[in-house]
Amino acid sequence: METLDNLLLKVVDKTMKQVFTETGTKVIYDFLENNSRLKREEIAKKPKIFSTGMKKLLGSGAPVIEKMILKDLYSKLELKLEEKDGYEFSDHIKELRKRLMHAYTYDVTIGILENTVKQAKVGDKEKMTP
């Protein structure tokens, strides 16, 4: 199973290369590293710094790129991106992390319960067997 961080990084790479080509994307990553001290590999862990750096470089174009990234990311997770007033790129990533953590916790809990029920049924059958 792919982590959210890995998926986000792949989506950022793909979107940037589609819009700015390979060379332009390298220039942007270099800018982020030199001006925001943000390495490409850190984008998923530091989305607010990524967003701030993109705004420094691209101005009003940054939110357009961020929205493209978010739409693709949500699509790959089979979720619908809900735009909210006052929400920024980093807010969406933070909320997505929470949603996925809740879903993971739910799946683990259900798995434990199902396993417990199976074990109880096996135990009941063993008691019945002479």
Where do the PLM segments sit?
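Long, compositionally biased intrinsically disordered regulatory segments in eukaryotic proteins
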Residues: 1-130
